[in-house]
Amino acid sequence: MARKTPIERYRNIGISAHIDAGKTTTTERILFYTGVNHKIGEVHDGAATMDWMEQEQERGITITSAATTTFWKGMSLQFPEHRFNIIDTPGHVDFTVEVERSMRVLDGAVMVYCAVGGVQPQSETVWRQATKYKVPRLAFVNKMDRQGANFFRVVEQMQTRLRANPIPVVVPIGAEDGFEGVVDLLKMKAIIWDEASQGMKFEYGDIPAGLESVAQEWREKMVEAAAEASEELMNKYLEEGELSEEEIIGGLRTRTLNCEIQPMLCGTAFKNKGVQRMLDAVIELLPSPIDVPPITGEEDGQPAIRPASDEAPFSALAFKLMNDPYVGQLTFFRAYSGVVSSGDTVLNSVKDKKERIGRIVQMHANDRKEIDEVRAGDIAAAIGLKDVTTGETLCAVDAPIILERMEFPEPVIHVAVEPKTKADQEKMGIALGRLAREDPSFRVRTDEESGQTIISGMGELHLEIIVDRMKREFGVEANVGAPQVAYRETITKTVTDVDGKHVKQSGGKGQYGHCVITLEPSGEGKGYQFFDEIKGGVIPREFIPSVDKGIQNTLNNGILAGFPVVDVTVRLTFGSYHDVDSSQIAFELAGSMAFKEAMRRASPVILEPMMAVEVETPEEYMGDVMGDLSRRRGIVQGMDDDGLGGKKVRAEVPLAEMFGYSTDLRSATQGRATYSMEFKHYSEAPRNVAEAVMAARK
């Protein structure tokens, strides 16, 4: 079957923004103008097409990136038909992993900013991710009709906060209630959209009288930016002082693809103005799959590349798993090279397992359309893959390749969950297993000490939504505990010649076990060590492992507060036995008694987990962030510039002090700082902390 749309007319784009910039509304308008939606879904009435999980419609925020395919021929039908694969990405900081994941499979992105709020914190995080993956991008300043809307302030914020190089290709006509349309700086004409047709129709007009000088000034900046794309263009511009429309678009395109500039547009998605011109800019200025470097990977341990061509062997990256109530698991994948048809067998090269692709569907938000094949550059979902996890490679069986893996952050918050009823127990295990497969930043484990199920994620909202999804999608009701800290106990000095004697000789078969031990600290991270130093057979060989076993049984229950004991060395130095009454159990008990007594004498202490915390913050909040970390008993270990005009602070902070940190950090920095943390090591808890912990366990 021949390709319907040539690959150079594909645009795989993400739409990315801070929570309230109006991204979902913008996506809705795109679907409307490109002819997919007949009735525009508004977010405020919970009808948006892309936000299809129930929680999203209730909360009015986007949690899962849905992928949608649509087509565009231009506002004036001036282009051949182009195919857009649009990935809608979440804007909440707890879902950053979703954004990171979609950045891997996009070729270009549209960053949506609010004309009032401007560049907000998550915009900075998303910008960093797009820079990391070298994603070319456009900026769309939305909500131009709102009180306080100011396009040029957003241009300035992009320069200062993001260190970006924004180049407006339109300027607004009016603002707030007076926002009427835009001046297209390429054509130097005003574009006014017709409200009666919901913006489907428009007309070009003359630039309003007071705007000519502003438009002229920004046009010159745009033409200069385009001229810098090549020596040829620069020479022509210097000689003639002007470039043709084709040359300007060509120059801007080259520099956008190299991530040197970010063309800017504006409008109001809600009032149906401006999105249409932005779609034209996606065709003119963002890359097709063949305009970006070919995907790289490993073939037999050697670096390999796969060009975006139907002739190359098939390779694809699974970037998202979703459960569909009707067809089961959907595996979203981006095909980088080759062709795959439904019914084909492919290789999951990460697990070295073959999988059969059952059916292939292309998604429009929550609707599915079955297709027969997927070609290089396309995005679709497969039904029927058994054992594929996010970030794994699917490829031709005879041409294995592992595409670069995605990196996911370690979860930073843990809570215990318990099913409300016995019936929920088994269902909860299945539900959590499925959710963990879908979302690599969410983990599940069983705590060996308490036997509880512990779930970990990227933030409090993340875990709330997981618990919510268990209830809605799997019908599992769960109680959620308060976040917990895993303390430990150890000793701080060496004690020698500690006796443990278990004697019971009052008629009948007696019991006799006697050992003498030395207990010493073994150093951080060394764990438990046992040395047999018995000489002259004072304890027979067969009883020595029993002493060790008795001590190990006691390790799980320290003498201060019942926490596990770590990093101790036991030397068995002396003892005695009875020919008839000695037994393995008697020596186990003797070992346990000796160890408990030795612990008491060896100055035991409580250890708490210390976390390596890294905070990225704009410079103006530096003082607040540092002050807050030291209030949390944190030790600042270094500071760097983050390359975006902000600072990176590295500190070591006890886990016990980090609960609620994401919320506190967000409010202290108006949400502009982000942080990550991971376990570093155990360290002795200060006396007041240890006393409080011990009191809480009594």
From Swiss-Prot:
One of its GO terms (cellular component) is cytoplasm. InterPro entries: EFG_II, EFG_III, EFG_III/V, EFG_IV, EFG_V, EFG_V-like, EFTu-like_2, G_TR_CS. CDD domains: EF-G, EFG_III, EFG_mtEFG1_IV, EFG_mtEFG_C, EFG_mtEFG_II. It is found in: Cytoplasm. GO terms for biological process: ribosome disassembly. Gene3D superfamilies: 3.30.230.10, 3.30.70.240, Elongation Factor G (Translational Gtpase), domain 3, P-loop containing nucleotide triphosphate hydrolases, Translation factors. Residues 8-290 form the tr-type G domain. Keywords: Cytoplasm, Elongation factor, GTP-binding, Nucleotide-binding, Protein biosynthesis. One of its GO terms (molecular function) is translation elongation factor activity. SMART domains: EFG_C (SM00838), EFG_IV (SM00889). Signal peptide: none annotated. Its main location: cytoplasm. GTP binds at residues 17-24, 88-92, 142-145. The keyword GTP-binding applies. Catalyzes the GTP-dependent ribosomal translocation step during translation elongation. During this step, the ribosome changes from the pre-translocational (PRE) to the post-translocational (POST) state as the newly formed A-site-bound peptidyl-tRNA and P-site-bound deacylated tRNA move to the P and E sites, respectively. Catalyzes the coordinated movement of the two tRNA molecules, the mRNA and conformational changes in the ribosome. PANTHER family: RIBOSOME-RELEASING FACTOR 2, MITOCHONDRIAL, TRANSLATION ELONGATION FACTOR G-RELATED. Belongs to the TRAFAC class translation factor GTPase superfamily. Classic translation factor GTPase family. EF-G/EF-2 subfamily. This is Elongation factor G. It comes from Laribacter hongkongensis (strain HLHK9). The gene is fusA.
